UniProtKB/Swiss-Prot annotation:
Top-level taxon of origin: Eukaryota
Signal sequence segment: 1-22
Protein name per the record: Probable feruloyl esterase C
Lineage of source species: Eukaryota, Fungi, Dikarya, Ascomycota, Pezizomycotina
Keyword Secreted: yes
Length: 272
């Protein structure tokens, strides 16, 4: 009798809990995709999709957005123009992630009326309807205006994205909402004369507050040192880190060959 009760309880709990776990897996899991690698159009705009060569329809993958800078385009992110291809993240993913590089409107991310957020929402729906994605493991990164767009995602889609990495960003794509916690990494040059360093601190401070971190001074490297200093905030509900480096408004902090931003971003994403 006791055995029967325990078995019934176990089965009841299994039925109750299974949808919770299933929610993390996208509708594309277990299906053969109708979407291939390459350029796709949606709602009159384009994005580039890169799926691992060993893709398994039954395995859930990370989903990573790489957002280009002002005057750039998705091809610059894919090929690596002034940056490592895919901001250096595809190499570090080792086949564990699906990558998306969208094209901004008029070579930027003004996000007027939330149109760029809506564009990324549509991409997510299309990609996840075709491929197996862990919906609790979406990420975004970008430089300059791409950083501003990553920040806008952190503001309005904190519940849909796990973490963002903002490279020399500014408040240039808006911040609708902006009250929810999300894992937030900022990387900013102390000599940035386009989107000033202090502005990057202000962006990060929103998530220091949202994530209920203990306040801390942002540490900086010495000018001319060609080095970086990292500040990890403590007591956060979700991690917040700020990397200050000796440089300006650079798509690739400390140079294209430097592993600083790619390593820090990928490790931060995986630890978030």
């Amino acid at each position: 009798m006791v055995h029967s009760i325990l078995l019934y309880t176990f089965l009841a709990l299994s039925v109750f809990l299974s949808p919770v776990f299933a929610e993390a897996r996208s509708p594309g899991c277990g299906k053969l995709p109708n979407l291939s690698n390459g350029v796709h159009k949606i709602n009159g705009r384009e994005y580039t999709l890169k799926v691992p060569s060993n893709y398994d329809k039954n395995k859930a993958y990370h989903l990573v957005f790489g957002l280009h800078w002002r005057g750039g385009n998705m091809g610059a992110v894919v090929k690596g123009e002034g940056v490592q291809p895919w901001y250096g993240l595809e190499k570090r993913a080792h086949g564990s992630a699906i990558f998306v590089a969208p094209n901004g409107k008029s070579a930027g991310w003004a996000n007027t009326g939330g149109q760029d957020i809506a564009f990324l929402d549509a991409i997510i729906k299309e990609v996840e309807s075709n491929y197996c994605v862990d919906q609790s493991s979406r990420f975004a990164t970008g430089f300059s205006w791409g950083g501003g767009m990553s920040y806008a995602l952190a503001c309005s889609r904190a519940k849909q994205f796990k973490a963002v990495s903002v490279l020399s960003g500014g408040l240039i794509s808006g911040c609708s909402g902006g009250n929810d916690p999300i894992a937030y990494l900022a990387i900013h040059g102390i000599k940035d004369n386009v989107l000033p360093f202090n502005g990057g601190i202000s962006l990060a401070n929103r998530f220091v507050k949202n994530n209920r971190c203990h306040q801390s001074e942002i540490h900086t490297p010495k000018s001319g040192s060609r080095s970086s200093v990292r500040t990890d905030f403590r007591g956060c509900s979700k991690p917040v880190s700020f990397i200050a480096y000796d440089g300006g408004h650079d798509a690739a902090p400390l140079g294209v060959g430097s592993s600083l931003a790619p390593d820090a971003t990928w490790k931060f994403f995986m630890a978030a």
